[in-house]
From Swiss-Prot:
Cofactor note: Binds 1 heme b (iron(II)-protoporphyrin IX) group per subunit.
Binding-site list for heme: C50
Protein name according to UniProt: Chloroperoxidase
Top-level lineage group: Eukaryota
Keyword tags: Chloride, Cleavage on pair of basic residues, Disulfide bond, Glycoprotein, Heme, Iron, Manganese, Metal-binding, Oxidoreductase, Peroxidase, Pyrrolidone carboxylic acid, Signal
Catalytic activity: RH + Cl(-) + H2O2 = RCl + 2 H2O
Necessary cofactors: heme b; Mn(2+)
Keyword presence, Signal: yes
Cysteine disulfide links: C100-C108
InterPro entries: Chloroperoxidase (IPR000028), Chloroperoxidase-like_sf (IPR036851)
Length: 373
C-alpha cells in the first residue's frame, strides 16, 4: 500500500516507527504515539521567518496559533520532534527572547509572545535567507518594504537551482548555495540595506545538515549528505517529510555536529563564485553571538501578510496543503507587537505604535543608565 509513498526507503521496518495513513490526505508517514499530523495555519495564526518553528507549530508540537510559547515547550519540541538538542538552539532562543522584549517593549519572561515578531529585520531575521525575501528587496523607495516572514518559492528555487539534478548535496554544494543567496540579495536589495549575516546563516547551514542529512547512508555522521527531497519538502510545506522516510535523528544532534558542519561548509572549495559578493563572503566567518539592546537595533514595521501554506499543484500529491482553506480575511490580526487587530491598510497607526514603543524603551534605557552612573 505504501510502496509508492516511501520510494527512497528500502525497509520501513528499519525505522523506529510503524507507518500510518494521515486521515484524508492519502499520505503515509512513520508514526509513533508522539507524532501529530500537519494542520495548515489559519489566517489568524502567527508564524515566523523560520521553517523549523513553523513546522513545529503546523504539527502542534508547539501551540498551533503560534502564541504564548514557553522556552521549555520550544526546547522539548526541538528535542523530541526534530532530534535537535538544547545545545543547538540555546543561542537562537536567547536571541528570540531578546527580540521579543525589544519589539513588545517589556520583558517577555519565559513566554514568547508570538512567532511573527521574530520577523523584525536584522535581528533574529536576516538578509540572504535560503527561502525568504529580504525586507527591502526590490523596493523602489527607502520607506517601502515587503514580506520578509513567509516562505517565498522564487527565493528558495534560487537555492535549489545550485543543486539541480542531484538527489543529495555536500558541504561544497551548500557553500555555493550560500554564496548564491548572498550575491542575489546584495544585488536586489535597496541600496544601503543589505547586511551580511554570515554567522547566523552558517548555523542554519549546519542545522540543515543536522536535520535532513540522509541517515540511510553508511557514512552519514562523518560525511553527511543532505537529502534534497527532505529539505525541499520541509521548507516548501513547513511540515516534516515523514512520508518520505524521514524521522528525527537519533541520538539527537548536539551543537558540536552543527558547528563542525558549518565550519566544513565555509572551508569547502566551490567550483564557481557568483559576482556581486559582499566583502568577506568567502572564507571563515565570525561566531554567532547573543543579541543585545546595546546593539544598534532599529524598529521597523513588520509585514502583516497572512501565514503561508503551499498551494502550488506542481508540488504533486505529497503536498499536504493543497486542500487547505485560503485566507479570506482582509484584517491583519496583529500589529507590532502583534497584540491588536488592525486593517492591513492602517500602516500609519502601526508606524506610530512602533515609534512610541521605541521612544519609551530609549527613555527607560537612558534612565537606567543614569541610575548606574
Amino acid at each position: 500500500m505504501f510502496s509508492k509513498v516511501l520510494p527512497f526507503v528500502g525497509a520501513v521496518a528499519a525505522l523506529p516507527h510503524s507507518v500510518r495513513q494521515e486521515p484524508g490526505s492519502g499520505i503515509g508517514y512513520p508514526y509513533d504515539n508522539n507524532t501529530l499530523p500537519y494542520v495548515a495555519p489559519g489566517p489568524t495564526d502567527s508564524r515566523a521567518p523560520c521553517p523549523a518553528l513553523n513546522a513545529l507549530a503546523n504539527h502542534g508540537y508547539i501551540p498551533h496559533d503560534g502564541r504564548a510559547i514557553s522556552r521549555e515547550t520550544l526546547q522539548n519540541a526541538f528535542l523530541n520532534h526534530m532530534g535537535i538538542a538544547n545545545s543547538v538552539i540555546e543561542l537562537a532562543l536567547t536571541n528570540a527572547f531578546v527580540v521579543c522584549e525589544y519589539v513588545t517593549g517589556s520583558d517577555c519572561g519565559d513566554s514568547l509572545v508570538n512567532l511573527t515578531l521574530l520577523a523584525e529585520p536584522h535581528a533574529f531575521e536576516h538578509d540572504h535567507s535560503f527561502s525568504r525575501k529580504d525586507y527591502k528587496q526590490g523596493v523602489a523607495n527607502s520607506n517601502d518594504f515587503i514580506d520578509n516572514r513567509n516562505f517565498d518559492a522564487e527565493t528558495f528555487q534560487t537555492s535549489l537551482d545550485v543543486v539541480a539534478g542531484k538527489t543529495h548535496f555536500d558541504y561544497a554544494d551548500m557553500n555555493e548555495i550560500r554564496l548564491q543567496r548572498e550575491s542575489l540579495s546584495n544585488e536586489l536589495d535597496f541600496p544601503g540595506w543589505f547586511t551580511e549575516s554570515k554567522p547566523i546563516q552558517n548555523v542554519e547551514s549546519g542545522f540543515i545538515f543536522a536535520l535532513v542529512s540522509d541517515f540511510n547512508l553508511p557514512d552519514n555522521d562523518e560525511n553527511p549528505l543532505v537529502r534534497i527531497d527532505w529539505w525541499k519538502y520541509w521548507f516548501t510545506n513547513e511540515s516534516f517529510p515523514y512520508h518520505l522516510g524521514w524521522h528525527p535523528p537519533s541520538p539527537a544532534r548536539e551543537i558540536e555536529f552543527v558547528t563542525s558542519a558549518s565550519s566544513a561548509v565555509l572551508a569547502a572549495s566551490v567550483t564557481s563564485t557568483p559576482s556581486s559578493l559582499p566583502s568577506g563572503a568567502i572564507g571563515p566567518g565570525a561566531e554567532a553571538v547573543p543579541l543585545s539592546f546595546a546593539s544598534t537595533m532599529t524598529p521597523f514595521l513588520l509585514a502583516t501578510n497572512a501565514p503561508y501554506y503551499a498551494q502550488d499543484p506542481t508540488l504533486g500529491p505529497n503536498d499536504k496543503r493543497e486542500a487547505a482553506p485560503a485566507a479570506t480575511t482582509s484584517m491583519a490580526v496583529f500589529k507590532n507587537p502583534y497584540l491588536e487587530a488592525i486593517g492591513t491598510q492602517d500602516i500609519k497607526n502601526q508606524q506610530a505604535y512602533v515609534s512610541s514603543k521605541a521612544a519609551a524603551m530609549a527613555s527607560a534605557m537612558a534612565a537606567n543608565k543614569a541610575r548606574n552612573l
